[in-house]
Regions:
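Phosphate- and divalent-cation-binding pockets in alpha/beta enzyme and binding domains
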Residues: 105-108, 140, 164, 185
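A metal-dependent, Asp-based hydrolase signature
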Residues: 3-67, 79-83, 87-90
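Conserved Lys-Pro-Asp/Glu-containing loop-to-beta segment of HAD-superfamily phosphomonoesterases
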Residues: 132-162
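Histidine/lysine/aspartate-rich catalytic loop segments that bind and position anionic ligands
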Residues: 99-132
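Surface-exposed amphipathic alpha-helices with a cationic face
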Residues: 82-90, 142-143, 162-167
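Acidic, Mg2+-coordinating phosphoryl-transfer loop and its flanking beta/alpha structural elements
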Residues: 153-186
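Short acidic capping loops at alpha-helix termini that bridge into adjacent secondary structure
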Residues: 56, 116-121, 149-153, 172
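Substrate-recognition element of Asp-dependent hydrolases with the DxDx(T/V) motif
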Residues: 60-65, 72, 81-111
Length: 186
């Protein structure tokens, strides 16, 4: 954004997003950990306005400078996802995905990991359904798969994931350490 606006905004953006620059780390309770891309984009506009730009100028700068990283390049599998999902599928366990990411990058990752055949349904942040920690993503997935939330397991790596699962009445809510949250937070 500095190249587009001439304003040094790195520190302000990192503070607003919940990114600790010195450790190169996303903070577990920060906006970057579980916020939809649209919300992060709007926050960027607000940060630019706080730097003295008008709403129109801030929107133009963000429009010109906004860049979404390639999800396939940035994604890291924490296990052999195909083998895990294949095994769950063989056990007749349905898999639904509720993500704070947008649909296009999520679909690209699913295709890159070659797991499309195992995903029964997914809800993404740009689907128009209230996002985490609201229960709506889980309840929507359960409705689509024709199961009661009390029969569902929600697995997540952020506190927003776990709050969403509990709010939806999931039968089991499991925190995993594959994301930015520490065990004490989950």
């Amino acid at each position: 954004f500095h190249q587009v606006s001439g304003i040094h905004v790195r520190n302000a953006l990192c503070d607003s997003f919940g990114y600790y620059q010195a450790a190169n780390k996303v903070l577990a309770h920060g906006m970057m950990a579980a916020s939809p891309m649209g919300k992060l984009r709007q926050l960027t506009v607000e940060v630019m306005q706080a730097q003295g730009l008008s709403a129109e100028q801030a929107e133009r700068v963000v429009e010109e400078g906004w860049c979404i990283p390639d999800p396939v390049i940035s994604a890291k599998q924490f296990t052999d996802t195909w083998t895990l999902f294949s095994y769950l599928h063989q056990q007749n366990i349905k898999i639904g995905i509720a993500t704070s990411d947008d649909r296009a990058p999520t679909q690209a990752m699913i295709e890159a990991f070659d797991i499309e055949e195992f995903i029964a349904t997914m809800v993404c942040s740009d689907d128009g359904i209230p996002s985490k920690p609201a229960p709506d993503m889980v309840t929507t997935i359960c409705q689509r798969m024709n199961i009661e939330p009390s029969k569902a397991m929600v697995i997540g790596d952020t506190t927003s994931d776990l709050k969403m699962g509990r709010a939806a009445g999931a039968g089991l809510v499991v925190g995993v350490l594959s994301g930015v949250s520490a065990a004490k937070d989950l």
